Amino acid sequence: PPEGEITKSVFMSQSTDIYTNLAMEDWMYRNMDFSDHHVMMVWRNEPCVVIGRHQNPWLEANVPFLGEKEISLARRNSGGGTVYHDRGNLNITFFTHRDRYDRKYNLELIKRALYRGFGIKSLINERQDILVRD
């Protein structure tokens, strides 16, 4: 792109496998140049539990129960807490250069998309959560 212009791309994963989606997310992070490129990855998963980089799965999840129910357990490379995913959960990853990262801007993109696409009114609170109903 010309000097100062930012290319924007959206990747929508066709996979619902947590390991494939985390691998794709990690590959993009490690191999793409975000100096003049903003990327959004959209993905969903079959039922799974995802733990943060430094978390102990035995403290964060009922591992025997996950095995009984055939629910995948995965570790992501980023920090953060343990979360449950299923096909009703939409995951969005924003990739941008560190100097251009703006959480509020990313949240506003999601807020606008909810309204434009579905007529859903939402707000962003002081904790930077998107609330549909508070």
Model-inferred region functions:
Residues 1-102:
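N-terminal lobe of the biotin/lipoate ligase/transferase fold
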Residues 87-134:
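Catalytic beta-strand/loop module used to bind and position nucleotide/cofactor moieties
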